């Protein structure tokens, strides 16, 4: 293809280029003089989804053992004083408690999704328990 000669043409309207030299220079020099780097933040929801995947993969107990043990002993005091517990009994209670709570939160999440929400609320827990027949 043969080359053709370019002729100068008059511009027809269009935006004139703005002068950004001063602002660009100021923007580039400002962070370097401050020296304080902004900490990295993930977008809202990213960490929550990562935690959901992590805890769904794992099988370890999520409630700390000693606080749970204190709670069990405190509740048992109302029924009989000076009760003693085997460590396996406390472990079984904790396993059952966490399994119950996980199931309840799964049902609660379904109730929230049914209401076209992504945030669970106390009314979702109440509805889930009512459907299960745990509470009238």
Curated annotation (Swiss-Prot):
Modified residues (5-glutamyl dopamine): 6
GO molecular function, one term: protein heterodimerization activity
N6-methyllysine: residues bearing it: 5, 10, 19, 24, 28, 37-38, 57, 65, 80, 123
Phosphothreonine, modified sites: 4, 7, 12, 81, 108
Allysine PTM sites in chain numbering: 5
Effect of residue 6 to A: Abolished serotonylation by TGM2
Sites of Symmetric dimethylarginine modification: 9
Effect caused by changing residue 78 to N: In BRYLIB1; uncertain significance
N6-butyryllysine: modified positions: 10, 19, 24
Residues that bear N6-crotonyllysine: 5, 10, 19, 24, 28, 57
Lipidation (N6-decanoyllysine): 19
Effect of residue 121 to I: In BRYLIB1; decreased protein abundance
Effect of mutating residue 35 to V: In GLM and BRYLIB2; glioblastoma multiforme samples; somatic mutation; affects regulation of gene expression and results in up-regulation of MYCN; results in global decrease of H3K36me2 and H3K36me3 levels; has no effect on H3K27me3 levels
Gene3D superfamilies linked to this entry: Histone, subunit A
Modified residues (5-glutamyl serotonin): 6
Effect of residue 129 to C: In BRYLIB1; uncertain significance
Residues recorded with modification N6-glutaryllysine: 15, 19, 24, 28, 57, 80, 116, 123
Result for mutant: residue 82 to H: In BRYLIB1; uncertain significance
N6,N6,N6-trimethyllysine: residues carrying this PTM: 5, 10, 28, 37, 57, 80
Family designation: Belongs to the histone H3 family.
Subunit structure: The nucleosome is a histone octamer containing two molecules each of H2A, H2B, H3 and H4 assembled in one H3-H4 heterotetramer and two H2A-H2B heterodimers. The octamer wraps approximately 147 bp of DNA. Interacts with HIRA, a chaperone required for its incorporation into nucleosomes. Interacts with ZMYND11; when trimethylated at 'Lys-36' (H3.3K36me3). Found in a co-chaperone complex with DNJC9, MCM2 and histone H3.3-H4 dimers. Within the complex, interacts with DNJC9 (via C-terminus); the interaction is direct. Interacts with ASF1A, MCM2, NASP and SPT2.
Domain notes: Specific interaction of trimethylated form at 'Lys-36' (H3.3K36me3) with ZMYND11 is mediated by the encapsulation of Ser-32 residue with a composite pocket formed by the tandem bromo-PWWP domains.
Function: Variant histone H3 which replaces conventional H3 in a wide range of nucleosomes in active genes. Constitutes the predominant form of histone H3 in non-dividing cells and is incorporated into chromatin independently of DNA synthesis. Deposited at sites of nucleosomal displacement throughout transcribed genes, suggesting that it represents an epigenetic imprint of transcriptionally active chromatin. Nucleosomes wrap and compact DNA into chromatin, limiting DNA accessibility to the cellular machineries which require DNA as a template.
Protein name, as recorded: Histone H3.3
Species, as recorded: Homo sapiens
Biological classification of the source: Eukaryota, Metazoa, Chordata, Craniata, Vertebrata
Gene name as annotated: H3-3A
């Amino acid at each position: 293809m043969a080359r053709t000669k370019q002729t100068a043409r008059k511009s027809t309207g269009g935006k004139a280029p703005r002068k950004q030299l001063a602002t660009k220079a100021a923007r580039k020099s400002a962070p370097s003089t401050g020296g304080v780097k902004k900490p990295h933040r993930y977008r809202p929801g990213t960490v929550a989804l990562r935690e959901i995947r992590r805890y769904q993969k794992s099988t370890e107990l999520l409630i700390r053992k000693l606080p749970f043990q204190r709670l069990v002993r405190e509740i048992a005091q109302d029924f009989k004083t000076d009760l003693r517990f085997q460590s396996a009994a406390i472990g079984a209670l904790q396993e059952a408690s966490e399994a119950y709570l996980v199931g309840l939160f799964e049902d609660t999440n379904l109730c929230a999704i049914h209401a076209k929400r992504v945030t669970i609320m106390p009314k979702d827990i109440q509805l889930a328990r009512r459907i299960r027949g745990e509470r009238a």
